[in-house]
Amino acid sequence: SGSLRQAAFKGLREDKTAAEVTQAPQAPTDVRATPQAKTTTTVKPLARSGKGKVVIAGVTISSPDKVLWPARAGHPAITKADLARYYEAAADRILPHVGDRPTSIIRAPDGITGETFFQRHAMTGSNPRLKLIDVKARSPYVAPVDVGGLVAIGQSGGLELHPWGCAPGQPEIPDQVTFDLDPDEGLAFADVIAASTVVKAKLESLDLPAFVKTTGGKGLHVVVPIKSDARSRVTWDQNKAFAKAVAEAIRADAPDRFTTTLAKK
């Protein structure tokens, strides 16, 4: 109540001065009266495509009310339509990191309380909004290239996106080096944050700007963007060798805090 939602500018009154434009008085409510035209503060319902379906970014969402995350204290349930709307709203932030890159997807078609599985390759009936990327000696991978592709992942119950660190459209050419901080079960997240600052400082001492990404779990990724043009590009083997050398150097500096051979139980 009192909040302005999804306002739209319609134009200026050319027949009056600004001082003459005032808010019209509120008419008494009459349930028998003819319904008035909707105002610009009304949120339009989602477009419908057949019984029980909605359309988001041009993608038909079946079973939009299916609960993917159950309600918990203070938080309502999150539905498949909610997930699709989130992908649509966050596309500008997500696509620079996943767009046109082979992407593995953790899917939970029946929600997080049901069965989940890891999808790397195209499956029968894959949504046409997802691009297929050929990778040498492997089956084609799927990749979102636009907002519709992200929403299509939401339609399939895709909850996590794990893109390759390659140049867009070029799976054999890395465009980043990623250091995966995978904490021991007994470590607090504050310890992981502190470790990420150590790794970031080490990289910046090598004149390599880096940034930190959350992973969806307890770990963090420290990412170094690298050039992928014809003159500067490296191979995946070179990428991995460099990452291993830096990781070993960090472990040697602080062997009580880091290991490169952690095996989770």
Question: What does each of the following model-derived ranges do?
Answer:
Residues I105-A108, A210-G216, T259-K264:
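Short beta-strand
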Residues H121-R138, A188-S205, V224-F258:
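Helical (often loop-to-helix) elements that flank the catalytic cores of nucleotide-handling enzymes
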Residues G2, Y87, F179:
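A residue-level signal for conserved active-site and pocket-lining positions in enzyme catalytic cores
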Residues S1-V55, T60:
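Intrinsically disordered, low-complexity regulatory tails
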Residues G52-D175:
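Active-site loop/lid in soluble adenylation, ligation, and acyl-transfer enzymes
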Residues T214-V224:
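Short, conserved phosphate-binding/catalytic loop or strand-edge motifs used
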Residues P70-L83, D180-V192, R231-N239:
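Short histidine-centered catalytic/ligand-binding loop motif
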Residues D92, G148, Q155-P163, P174-S196, ...:
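Long, contiguous binding/interaction regions
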